[in-house]
Amino acid sequence: MKTKLGFNRLSRKSSHRRALLKNMVISFLKHEKISSTKAKLFEVKRFAERLITRAKVDTVHNRRELSKFIHDKYILNKLFTKISPVFRQRSGGYTRMIKLGKRYGDAAEMAILELVEKPLKVE
């Protein structure tokens, strides 16, 4: 029996967890860098990598599928036009996590999640 497969529940109910991840992924795609606890960033990384992989093929179907998760049209357009073209030759590993150490208040492991390559400057 395979155990411990799946995802981290982050001590939240499913709707709260989904909203948290959705907001963090949108912030990550907007700013191309995000700082939070290591556990949250592992989950954000999983979603962001899937979204970038899906956005590498710019079709109407893929745009509609990703718009179910990303409701901001500006971020969706940025993902398809600026972020995903940079990673066309890369088959995965679009993000990197840099560990920052422990947070002062509760000793939670902190980290930064950022894109491996800088997005295109489209005018």
From Swiss-Prot:
One of its GO terms (biological process) is translation. The keyword Ribosomal protein applies. The keyword Protein transport does not apply. PROSITE patterns: RIBOSOMAL_L17. One of its GO terms (cellular component) is cytosolic large ribosomal subunit. Keywords: Ribonucleoprotein, Ribosomal protein. One of its GO terms (molecular function) is structural constituent of ribosome. Gene3D superfamilies: Ribosomal protein L17 (3.90.1030.10). InterPro entries: Ribosomal_bL17, Ribosomal_bL17_CS, Ribosomal_bL17_sf. Pfam families: Ribosomal_L17. Part of the 50S ribosomal subunit. Contacts protein L32. PANTHER family: LARGE RIBOSOMAL SUBUNIT PROTEIN BL17M, RIBOSOMAL PROTEIN L17. HAMAP family: Ribosomal_bL17. Belongs to the bacterial ribosomal protein bL17 family. This is Large ribosomal subunit protein bL17. It comes from Borrelia garinii subsp. bavariensis (strain ATCC BAA-2496 / DSM 23469 / PBi) (Borreliella bavariensis). The gene is rplQ.
